[in-house]
A protein has these predicted regions:
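Non-catalytic structural scaffold of enzyme domains
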Residues: 1-143
């Protein structure tokens, strides 16, 4: 197994929870976390801006030798993950829109989603919602 690190990026520190979970499963793996607070929040960025930010963050992590990049941000995942996978020759893992686990686990048939406008307006969010939450009532609000 390669000693190269696993890279993470997010628009801030929200993805630290994900980093901790990965660390608990893979404690001996080297990891690099990029908290991109300069460009935060990502939710109000145009698709072009978000692509540029995600490409730049990925290039930074690749320069550090990362063997895998985890996009620890819903907005960047929903808007950019497929473009990142096509552009770079390393695996990318993204964050699945949270409506899926919420819809699968609701006891009341209702779910609430608090996300950026970018996430709520993305094709991936709508596909996931249509596939997994069509039988529940969802209340969606932006966090911005």
């Amino acid at each position: 197994m390669s000693n190269n690190p696993i890279g993470f990026f997010d628009s801030g520190i929200g993805g630290v929870t994900l980093w901790k979970e990965v660390h608990s499963i893979l404690p001996y793996e080297n990891k690099i976390y990029l908290a991109d607070s300069i460009n935060s929040p990502y939710g109000d960025k145009s698709d072009k801006e978000l692509d540029e930010i995600s490409f730049k963050n990925s290039e930074f992590l690749l320069e550090k030798g990362c063997k895998l990049i985890i996009v620890a941000c819903n907005t960047a995942t929903t808007k950019c993950i497929e473009k990142l996978r096509r552009r770079f020759d390393v695996p990318f893992i993204g964050i699945e829109p949270a409506i899926k686990p919420a819809a699968l686990n609701t006891k009341t048939g209702k779910v609430g989603v608090l996300a950026t406008e970018g996430t709520l307006g993305s094709d991936l969010f709508h596909k996931t919602s249509n596939k997994h939450a069509s039988s529940v009532r969802s209340e969606e609000h932006t966090s911005e």
